[in-house]
Amino acid sequence: QVLDLSEDFRRHVVDAFAQEYLAGRTPNPCVVCNRTVKFGGMLDYALEQGMDCVATGHYAHAAYDPETGRWKLYRGGSAKDQSYVLYGLSQQQLAHIRFPLWGMEKEQVRALAREAGLPVADKGDSMEICFVPKGGHAAFLEWYTGAPMKPGDFVDETGKVLGRHQGIGRYTIGQRKGLGVAFGRPRYVVRIDAARNEVVLGEEGRQTASSLLADDLRYLSIVPPCGPIRITARIRYQAPDAPALLTPLADGTAR
């Protein structure tokens, strides 16, 4: 039996992906897909059919902690850890998910797949977004929205115009390559102003920051803190962990 969740996928994942890029942000559609489709519609359907849980091939682990009364999400224990794309799950969702590949390495999984005669055993790894073709996300956005991206100005941090960009959806914070303009020395995207249709560029060192604002928070393993707590954090996949201070703010975000 095939469960058709294509409309949910389009509405929750693809539409949101396009909206975020055109607002000057860089989304992670896998996070949204896991929360709303794989462990949203699919998990709901499984439970309605009387099943206890859904098992997937994510490299992660979930376990119940009787001392805190909470389900905790753990890293997959391998170089292919995928726990970061599962952070948006709720306690109710985690209670009904199993991750049988936890603690295994990718080559172990491939070997088991070969033994079972599965045709995907030697399929290459993919880090690409599943619904974006090889032409890249910019071309996809133009096709999906039916409108070409609007050119605008590259500016420095004082507002001085440095050149022209080909649409804010083509750029992301920290980007240096592929700007399409030669500036004589390295320039990095430090901010995207969607309201003004401007891409703000800075020189070496200006692409770093000592703090950030985080939203869409999920305190999976702990009760939401009332004050600052010491944590380790990483700002992107495969970046090293770093000590940090998390300060909850009144609007539900955190610094």
Regions found by a protein language model. Name each.
Residues R70-K72, K160, E198, T253:
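Residue-level signal for well-ordered, solvent-exposed loop/turn and beta-edge residues enriched
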Residues P119-D122, T158-R164, R196-V199:
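Conserved beta-loop-beta connector loops within the AMP-binding
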Residues H137, R164-G178, L212, I231-A242:
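Active-site-adjacent loop/helix segments that line or gate small-molecule/cofactor pockets in enzymes
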Residues H137, V161, I168-Y171, G178-G180, ...:
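Short, catalytically relevant binding-site loops at active-site mouths
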Residues G152-R170, F183-V190, D241:
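Short beta-strand/strand-turn micro-motif
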Residues R185-Y188, I192-R255:
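Basic, glycine-rich polyanion-binding accessory segments appended to enzymes
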